[in-house]
Amino acid sequence: MLSVAARSGPFAPYLSAAAHAVPGPLKALAPAALRAEKVVLDLKRPLLCRESMSGRSARRDLVAGISLNAPASVRYVHNDVTVPDFSAYRREDVMDATTSSQTSSEDRKGFSYLVTATACVATAYAAKNVVTQFISSLSASADVLALSKIEIKLSDIPEGKNVAFKWRGKPLFVRHRTQAEINQEAEVDVSKLRDPQHDLDRVKKPEWVILVGVCTHLGCVPIANSGDFGGYYCPCHGSHYDASGRIRKGPAPYNLEVPTYQFVGDDLVVVG
């Protein structure tokens, strides 16, 4: 009971412990001798504990009072609190608390804008290099590009003949035109063509015509020196091309493709 009263917290001052001896129904054969012992209190008990502080807690509402002969209040001041100093993060222009920061506002903004713009330009340049290297890694290597070109000796192709080569997995037509074919294709009215294009815009030398031998309709291979116009004829669906590779009749929508080529001397051409 004593321990319960001591541990009851703020209710300890209002509780008291009592012990009563209740005699039993049987009488004792001999009177028992009772010896009273003194209860020794532990005076060395620490002050700041639950049992010791329970008697010092406020039992009523807190009321502030003032007197002429007594101190007005009790202050609890914490002298260990320090105000943080941000001087290491502030600029020299705004270190003085008595000076307005508006006088140096434009200079500080200009410096911030300059640093931001420089960082953006550097980031864009680095991103451009990364993207360029990534795209270049996807492109064909030097050995593949070397195989993508073909050299053709023009002296092996007689006049009026067409020779087919294999270039990048496609047929390549090289035609040595006669003067009559050159004059005939030059006189064609461009306005009447489905895909208007002048003959001189499709050749670098009038006597040589270099074309990709794939029909622009469904990708068939035309037959050279045949058709209604003496150029190329696709037997799959009846597309007729002239000696310049221009569509003249049939379902094909465009002219035959002219690849990239250049003449290396008078007797050699490099396609690709």
Curated annotation (Swiss-Prot):
What residue ranges are annotated as transmembrane?
105-138
Superkingdom of origin: Eukaryota
- Gene Ontology CC annotation, any one: respiratory chain complex III
The entry marks the following residues as binding [2Fe-2S] cluster, namely C215, H217, L218, C234, H237, S239
- Explain the post-translational modification: Proteolytic processing is necessary for the correct insertion of UQCRFS1 in the complex III dimer. Several fragments are generated during UQCRFS1 insertion, most probably due to the endogenous matrix-processing peptidase (MPP) activity of the 2 core protein subunits UQCRC1/QCR1 and UQCRC2/QCR2, which are homologous to the 2 mitochondrial-processing peptidase (MPP) subunits beta-MPP and alpha-MPP respectively. The action of the protease is also necessary for the clearance of the UQCRFS1 fragments.
Q: Which GO terms describe its biological process?
A: mitochondrial electron transport, ubiquinol to cytochrome c
Q: How is the cofactor bound?
A: Binds 1 [2Fe-2S] cluster per subunit. Fe-S cluster delivery to the Rieske protein is mediated by components of the iron sulfur (Fe-S) cluster assembly machinery that reside in the mitochondrial matrix (including HSC20 and LYRM7).
Enzyme kind, highest EC tier? translocase
The entry assigns this protein to a family as follows: Belongs to the Rieske iron-sulfur protein family.
- Additional remarks: The Rieske protein is a high potential 2Fe-2S protein.
Output the NCBIfam families linked to this UniProt entry.
Rieske_proteo
Which protein is depicted?
A: Cytochrome b-c1 complex subunit Rieske, mitochondrial
Organism, per UniProt? Gallus gallus
Taxonomic placement:
Eukaryota, Metazoa, Chordata, Craniata, Vertebrata
